[in-house]
Every structure is written in C-alpha cells, then in structure tokens.
Amino acid sequence: MECEVTTVIDRPVSIVWDFFAVHHVENHPRWDPDIELEKATDAPIDVGTVIRRRSTRFETPTEGTMEITEFVPERIMRVRTQDGPMTINGWALFSTPSSGRTELTIGGEFPGLDDSMKKTILPLMERSAATIKSLIESER
C-alpha cells in the first residue's frame, strides 16, 4: 500500500529543503510528536546516513532505523525505515510551482498493509504536512 500527500508552502525550496531534509533529525519530532530521532554520527545528512528512531504512535512503542537512500538537494529525499518488523520506503519530493513557493510531496510505501490501513495512515500524513507548512511559514 502507498500513501502520499502534497502541500504548497509559501517559501522558497531552499528554505523548505533546509527545514525538512538538512535538519530532519531536529525538526521531524516537531511535526510528528510520536517520533524521536537521533543520528548515529555527527556528519551532515546524506546518502547512507543512519538515524535511530523510536515511534510511540501505536499501542506498542517500536524502535528502528531510517537510512537515507537518496538525497538530491532541493529535489528528493528518500529513506528506508525499519520500524520494528516492517520496512517502509518513504520519500519527500520538492518542486517549485511558482516563484517563492514550494510543493512538498511526502509519501510512503507500506508493504504488507492493505488499502484499509489508508484511513489510519493518511490522516497522520496530512497532519504532518499541515504542521510542516505551518512551522516553516511561521518561522522563516
């Protein structure tokens, strides 16, 4: 099953990229308070970076990792997340629909889940996208 949401943020792609991708570890818990992240090293995020994660979203907390699998500045960030026994392939796509605005599409592929789970996962992704938009537009 795949889920994907798109939002348009009234800021240039450089600012959205910096907030979402470059400072992902610091900012992800701000838009998704059910997630705690910690980089395994102090190096900047790039392909191969491993991030430890803990999710308290559902009844049983799960520990796992995120590995950056693609990192094209101001265009694409892809991750492979090991969330307990599940592997999730996630992405964030960045485009510029007009000057000073950024279209951010976030999505994930959730193998083994059927489409009935969309009603649980999609609202969480929509909440995250709305919070990302609000945080970026209010801070920068």
Sequence positions of predicted segments:
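A generic structural motif
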Residues: 14, 73-74, 99
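Hydrophobic ligand-binding cavity/cleft-lining segments
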Residues: 1-42
